Structures are given as C-alpha cells and as structure tokens.
C-alpha cells in the first residue's frame, strides 16, 4: 500500500535500524522504544493484521520474533519478553500492517505495562455456550 508506513520501511523508502531481513520478513527497532531493544517484526508484503495474514507468512514472522526474544534475554540480559500483536483499532492497533512487538522486560515498571483484570460487569456468563460458539467456528 502506497501510504502504509511499514510498507515504505519494507521497501527501503524510510530508513530503519534493521535487525533481520529475508525475502518475506523484516525486523527493526521500534522508533518509540518502550524498553531498550523493543523490536517490530513485519511481513514485507502488506497484510492488515495477524488475522488477515496467510499462515506461512505469519509462522515466518513468529519464528523471527521467537529468535529475537531469545537473543534479547541472552544478549541484552532481559528478564522476560512480551510478544504481542494487536488486531484492529479497538484492540490498540495503530498501524494497519501486521506487526509483532517483541518487547524485552528488565524489571517491573520498566516502561511497559499490560494488565488484564476480571471484568465484574460481565456476571453470570454462560461459559459453555461461549465455548460452543467458538468451537463451531473452528
């Protein structure tokens, strides 16, 4: 896509701090470092998000993300890693090109916070019915 920031980076029109590159995948440092070493992994071809990406390409991106996370722990001495991808604006996706954040974690309060809490406004959920609905779609 001509107006996609990540497509422009993948095509070399916008410079980046490249970490890894092959025919299908590019990994580079996020210009907005949440923690030291925060890396983005993208397919070079445009796909809107994780859910729209063909499995072969998604698997290649995940393999690269896994390797980068391992290196961040080994060589940057991170204590852990968050690997995540937001799908759609409502889930926090701001650039509509599939990308995986690989965020090394050094200590609590290091600049990144991901919290999940039980939503008490959803009482009396019928979990078997919800599970059945999802199962039917698989």
Q: What label would you give each PLM region?
A:
Residues 1-138:
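HIT superfamily nucleotide-processing domains
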């Amino acid at each position: 896509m001509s107006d996609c920031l990540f497509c422009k980076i993948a095509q070399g029109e916008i410079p980046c701090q490249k970490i890894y590159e092959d025919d299908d995948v590019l990994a580079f440092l996020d210009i907005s470092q949440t923690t030291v070493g925060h890396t983005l992994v993208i397919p070079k071809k445009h796909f809107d998000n994780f859910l729209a990406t063909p499995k072969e390409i998604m698997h290649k991106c995940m393999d690269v993300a896994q390797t980068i996370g391992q290196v961040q722990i080994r060589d940057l001495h991170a204590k852990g890693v968050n690997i995540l991808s937001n799908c759609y604006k409502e889930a926090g996706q701001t650039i509509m090109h599939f990308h995986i954040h690989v965020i090394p974690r050094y200590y609590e309060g290091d600049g990144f916070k991901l919290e999940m809490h039980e939503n008490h406004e959803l009482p009396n959920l019928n979990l078997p019915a919800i599970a059945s609905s999802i199962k039917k779609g698989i």
